[in-house]
């Protein structure tokens, strides 16, 4: 997973986090400039989290953990001095379901929330192909094996 270079992407400033739908999808209001704002559904790029809406109780619990972790990361991200920025590719910045594909950055951080999700065991790396469902891997990274 390689986030886009700052010079080869669009950077959208988030003015409001409307809702965290699950561990890899959020609804936000972005500032387009000139007093124009747009509500966007954002698919967090390069990651896949366990599903919250499933009959599999193990996956459901891990999916809720990922959602809660993301909410915690975003809590206060736009109310303080730091901005939440969504960085998207210049070409191909939309996913197959019409969602904006983005890397999330808070303030001047150089590491994206997307990368931290993987490193801390809340998501698998995902390139749009076959989804991974190795729950044991996530538990081991988080130390809850």
Language model features: what each stretch is:
Residues 1-145:
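Small beta-barrel nucleic-acid-binding modules, primarily SNase/OB-fold domains
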């Amino acid at each position: 997973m390689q986030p886009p270079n700052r010079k080869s992407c669009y950077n959208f400033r988030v003015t409001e986090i409307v809702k965290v739908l699950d561990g890899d999808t959020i609804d936000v209001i972005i500032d387009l400039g000139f007093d124009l704002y747009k509500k966007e559904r954002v698919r967090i790029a390069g990651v896949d989290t366990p599903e919250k809406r499933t009959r599999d109780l193990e996956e459901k619990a891990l999916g809720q953990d990922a959602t809660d972790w993301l909410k915690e990361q975003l809590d206060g991200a736009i109310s303080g001095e730091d901005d939440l920025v969504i960085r998207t590719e210049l070409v191909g910045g939309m996913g197959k379901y019409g969602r904006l594909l983005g890397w999330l950055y808070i303030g001047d951080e150089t590491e994206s929330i997307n990368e931290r999700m993987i490193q801390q065991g809340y998501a698998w790396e995902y390139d749009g192909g076959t989804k991974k469902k190795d729950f044991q891997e996530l538990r081991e990274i988080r130390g809850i094996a």
